[in-house]
Amino acid sequence: MIVFKGFNKNMVCTMGRGNFKYGIGKKAVADKAKTANTGLHSTREPFGILHYYGNLGTDIHCICEASGDINEDSQGRVASTELTPLKKLTPQELAIYEAIYIQKHPHSSNERFGESAEDNGYYSIARGKNPKAAGKKGTVVILLQEYTRSTRIKALEIYDIDGKTNKAGWYGIGGYIGAKRKIKESQNT
């Protein structure tokens, strides 16, 4: 099962019972798995790990494989007897995984995004009937457009603001809409 896990800057997990050191490609093993009690913990939803390791500048966030005995709860938390970190993710990659998760599970996401957003230095995510988001160079703009009479996702657009193909500024479904656009204006269009 593909899951997500956060760590401190040394890839040590300090939540739970003691410290545990992980490594990319190295399988960690536990005797038992019970969510919020014992085992190796992770989340199904990418941004779920930010509740535990939320510093995008220093914490490490990975996509992992959970295997062995697996126990899940209704909040998307996973405990397993085997956990292998597969790859470190940039904050931008983590946000893209979150957008894909929301597209597949529009009603199960614990995260709430407004119809208008500005970047946090890494990404901006907007969700709604007419989403708009702004990004500076080096960030990712993610737009999740909902159907008119539903919260299911109709369209997902991702813009890597590189300053060449995609310039800094505001984006809506369909692309670039301007360099300067106030939040109030974007919410009312």
Where do the language-model regions lie?
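Short, glycine-biased loop/turn motifs at secondary-structure junctions and
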Residues: 1-189
